[in-house]
Amino acid sequence: AGARLAGAKQLIAVDRHDSKLEMARAFGATEVLKADESTRAEILKLTCQRGADYVFEAVGSPKVQEASFGSVRPGGKLVLVGLSPMGSETDFPGSIITRQEKTVLGSYYGSCDPQRDFPLYAGLYLDGRLELDSLVSKTYTLQEINSAYSDMLEGRISRGAILF
């Protein structure tokens, strides 16, 4: 939804879980791909062999971060949103970053300015231009927290919320 508001025309979503791909399509993805060994080739095919202008990696796995880098076009940006485990390392080839002028950057909490951005997002939501309610696919009580965690790990939900 946010990428659409920013003017993106082609949005390719990649995930291992069908529920998250369905949600991505509902929120504006033009193509959805099941994550596997052919993902990079599929992204290149969908982008006429260019690669993606922006890749947002939200898993936090160094292996996935490295694979995501290969889907970025020369001059494009890889934005690391997912938190990697403390002490883990991700290997990006410096010579390719330089020669292809790719950018790798981190984004914590959306790199937002809460005083400026939260009122903007609230206004977009209240105006009906930013759909948020559908992000939560299931709610849980505090007593159901273990089930919520299990559902999240197993990919049975897109997003869960604990209500207390």
Regions found by a protein language model. Name each.
Residues 56:
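N-terminal Rossmann-like NAD(P) cofactor-binding module of classical short-chain dehydrogenase/reductase
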Residues 76-77, 92-134:
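Rossmann-fold dehydrogenase core element
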Residues 72-74:
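Helix-to-beta-strand junctions that scaffold the AdoMet/dcAdoMet cofactor pocket
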Residues 66-70, 115-164:
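C-terminal hydrophobic helical "lid"/dimerization subdomain
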Residues 29, 51-52, 132, 145:
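Local beta-strand N-terminus motif with an aromatic residue
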Residues 38-49:
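Short amphipathic alpha-helix with an adjacent loop that forms part of the alpha/beta core around
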Residues 81-82:
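Acidic carboxylate diad motif detector
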Residues 1-37:
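Mid-domain Rossmann-like dinucleotide-binding core that forms the NAD(H)/NADP(H) cofactor-binding site
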